[in-house]
Design a protein with these regions (language model features):
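Short beta->alpha connector loops at strand-helix junctions that form conserved
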Residues: 45-46, 266, 288-289
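N-terminal capping/small domains of soluble enzymes
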Residues: 1-104, 110-114, 302
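Short beta->alpha connector loops
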Residues: 22-27, 110-113, 186-190, 268, ...
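Extended, intrinsically disordered, low-complexity segments
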Residues: 64-71, 244, 304-332
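Alpha/beta enzyme core
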Residues: 32-37, 41, 111-263, 271-285, ...
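C-terminal helical cap(s) of enzyme catalytic domains, especially alpha/beta-barrels
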Residues: 51-67, 217-235, 278, 290-315
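Flexible, active-site-proximal loop/turn residues at the rims of small-molecule/cofactor binding pockets
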Residues: 23, 48, 137, 212, ...
Length: 332
């Protein structure tokens, strides 16, 4: 019988659909609902050590419309989770007992070698199936920077050498060889070059893309930013359907030029979007923004739609489908 089983960096997934690190994975109740709906994996919202625990101000999210269609894009100035690494550890251990066939991925952000090492140890102790390292959040760069250093120095995803050395630090910290996923940003001049740093550092997989850096705009009546807290705002990240072409471009560049598994994320709203990422070489598909609009149950129609497509096109497995469209992409 045809199924959606696929391996990602050596880890078997019941299906490729994974809840991305986001508000949708930021509580035990939300994770429970996503698992009941049928998601194959969960990336818990990114966490850090207590000294970096944010105090989230609201409002920090807003939808953007285009041609009368609401939430054509989504903009946020959200930060990492307010939950502690201990809470994430507890949830990983708890859900692995209840859902041994699903995959639980801890997402971490750190400032400096000692912090990366401690966070990796914590996630391995909890039994995380994989570790996703957030090195690229466009609105989180200042909140996690090493004291006394420029924020740019805390963003490995923008520099090949820093990416290489940071990834090496993370890999050396492992005691159980838990697969490490490095999350990439599109906000760089040469994505493939920076990604090579992660590969050189020993990363097991890449996740692409993080949100696209931007600014929501100004209310012309008041002069204030459209999304503000007491009149003040900052630069944030754009997600949703509007960024899908950017994500597809980034994922396909990585899968075509590098020999490393890639998780695709960015603008996935239905099975058709997911199929495009798979055809361009992604072995895992993460969803963030669409869940806030359609709910966790959207994964059921995604599974059914993808299975129908595979049957119609004669793909006996997802392995047969992954990367099938890559040969059609050529340089000018």
């Amino acid at each position: 019988m045809m199924n959606l089983n696929i391996s990602f960096a050596g880890v078997p997934f019941e299906n490729p659909f994974t809840v991305a690190a986001s508000p949708s994975s930021d509580s035990r109740e939300k994770v429970r609902r996503s698992l009941e709906a049928g998601w194959g994996g969960i990336v818990f919202k990114t966490t850090a050590l207590p000294q970096h625990s944010p105090k989230l101000a609201e409002p920090n999210m807003a939808g953007l419309s285009f041609a009368g269609k609401p939430q054509f894009a989504f903009y946020n100035i959200d930060l990492i989770s307010e939950r502690t690494i201990e809470e994430i550890q507890e949830d990983i251990a708890y859900f692995k007992q209840l859902y041994p066939d699903r995959r639980f991925i801890g997402s971490i952000m750190a400032a400096g070698e000692e912090e990366w090492i401690e966070l990796v140890h914590r996630l391995e102790e909890a039994g995380a199936d994989m570790i996703e390292c957030s090195m690229s959040c466009p609105q989180g760069e200042h909140s996690i920077a090493d004291e006394g250093k420029k924020a740019s120095n805390a963003i490995p995803a923008a520099d090949r050498e820093l990416m290489r050395t940071t990834t090496q630090t993370i890999l050396r910290a492992r005691k159980k060889n838990t697969p490490v996923i490095v999350k990439m940003t599109p906000n760089v001049t040469d994505l493939v070059d920076v990604a090579r740093g992660a590969v050189e550092g020993g990363a097991d997989a890449l996740c692409c893309i993080d949100t696209v850096r931007g600014f929501i705009g100004i209310d012309l009546e008041t002069g204030y930013p459209k999304l503000n807290v007491n009149g003040l705002s900052t630069w944030g990240g754009l997600s949703g359907p509007a960024v899908k072409p950017i994500a597809l471009g980034c994922v396909s560049k990585l899968t075509k030029e590098l020999d490393i598994p890639v998780a695709g994320v960015g603008g996935v709203s239905n099975w058709q979007d997911a199929a495009e990422f798979l055809l361009l070489g992604a072995r895992n598909v993460q969803v963030c923004t669409a869940i806030s609009r359609y709910g966790f149950g959207m994964v059921q129609s995604m599974q059914k739609g993808l299975l129908r497509y595979m049957e119609q096109k004669g793909f006996a497995s997802l392995d047969a489908m992954v990367g099938k469209s890559l040969p059609y992409l050529v340089d000018h």
